[in-house]
Regions:
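N-terminal glycine-rich phosphate-binding loop and ensuing alpha1 helix
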Residues: 1-67
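Residues at the starts of beta-strands that form the adenosine-phosphate
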Residues: 8, 53-55, 79, 136-137, ...
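A structural signal for short hydrophobic beta-strand segments in well-ordered beta-sheet cores
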Residues: 31, 153-155, 216
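Short internal beta-strands
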Residues: 56-60, 140-141, 296
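Conserved beta-loop-beta/alpha segment of the NTase-like Rossmann-fold superfamily
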Residues: 66-157
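Catalytic-core segments of class I nucleotidyltransferases/pyrophosphorylases
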Residues: 109-111, 118, 124-131, 142-147, ...
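A structural motif detector for beta-strand N-caps
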Residues: 244, 249-256, 261-262, 267-273, ...
Length: 318
């Protein structure tokens, strides 16, 4: 028997990125650059690996930059459609708007993925599990990484969502799971979403849970939050694994030293400058003999000659 797949996926990428400021004043959070493509690339690749041949991405904040980031990711045989939001609709409202525009098709369940995480999940069997059960929504779940940092999902014996707790120490007998921002949504649940701004926990999960039709499925893989500048830097450093990565459009003096850092597009690094465990991208200019350590510099930022920057976040729109 051939495993079933999700033909259509939607990636949520329209938020303002308030916690990512000041970086999100230059680029939307899902468009932030990383060595293997923008943050949203992992969501796009996951949707493709799950069988999607049509991916809808909603965009609003700095929409043109988000569109450029999506276009960077090469996905053979996949149609990518942008759903522009003049008014920010929220996570549930964005789904409803894409539905009303006919972008999500008219049949089958839809795979919905948050666009602001760095994730690599094994969704083999996830569609089969979702479609075989009488669930309006099925959450992909991971064993919890840090219950005191992120919300906890608790399942009952039938793999229905019993509780969703805020971050905190679990009860001794509780088995907490982490929601990494991936779910399957049945067509009738999509049709029930109000055509108005709203958020998924209230507008989608709430009604499904009230009917005991909000399920969870534990999957294998990894997830890292990219919610704040500190998160972003840590995820980039993990991807680098001790190496330096320099974009082809960057200009780096032969006398500069790049150590375990990401030098992104249009950056200019002068002679004898040292960049260590940092991100420098989107047109940053680093002067002669300057040092940048454990920092993120984005946009029209200019580092003076011999300036020493440690643990800073600087971002200036071009």
């Amino acid at each position: 028997m051939t495993a079933r797949v999700f033909k259509t996926a939607m990636i949520l990428a329209a938020g303002r990125g308030e916690r990512m400021r000041p970086l999100s004043s230059v680029l939307p959070k899902p468009a932030l650059p990383m060595p293997d493509g923008p943050v949203v690339a992992s969501a796009l690749r996951l949707a493709t690996s799950a069988g999607a041949t049509r991916i809808v991405v909603n965009v609003s904040h700095l929409a043109e930059h988000m569109a450029e980031a999506v276009a960077e990711v090469s996905l053979a045989g996949v149609e990518i459609v942008l759903s522009f939001e003049d008014e920010l609709m929220g996570t549930a409202g964005g789904l409803a708007l894409a539905r009303d525009r006919g972008l999500l098709g008219w049949e089958d369940s839809v795979l919905v993925i948050n666009g602001d995480g760095a994730l690599g999940l094994d969704l083999e069997g996830f569609a089969d599990h979702h479609l075989a059960r009488d669930e309006l929504v099925t959450l992909a779940l991971l064993p919890h990484l840090d219950p005191e940092r992120w919300s906890r999902v608790v399942l009952d014996a039938e793999e229905r969502v019993e509780e969703i707790h805020p971050p905190g120490r679990p009860d001794p007998l509780e088995v907490p799971f982490l929601y990494p921002g991936v779910m399957a949504v049945r067509r009738d649940a999509l049709e029930g979403l109000p055509a108005a701004p709203g958020e998924i926990p209230v507008s989608l999960w709430g009604p499904a849970r009230a009917k005991r039709k909000l399920g969870g499925r534990v999957v294998a893989g990894h997830w890292r939050e990219v919610g704040t500048p500190a998160d972003y830097l840590e995820v980039v450093l993990l991807r680098l694994a001790g190496r330096a990565w320099i974009d082809a459009s960057a200009e780096v003096s032969s006398g500069a030293s790049i150590r375990n850092s990401f030098v992104g597009c249009r950056a200019m690094i002068s002679d004898r400058a040292v960049i260590e465990e940092s991100v420098v991208a989107e047109g940053v200019c680093v002067g002669e003999g300057a040092r940048v350590t454990r920092s993120v510099l984005l946009g029209a930022v200019e580092v003076s000659a011999h300036e020493d920057i440690v643990g800073e976040i600087r971002a200036t729109p071009p």
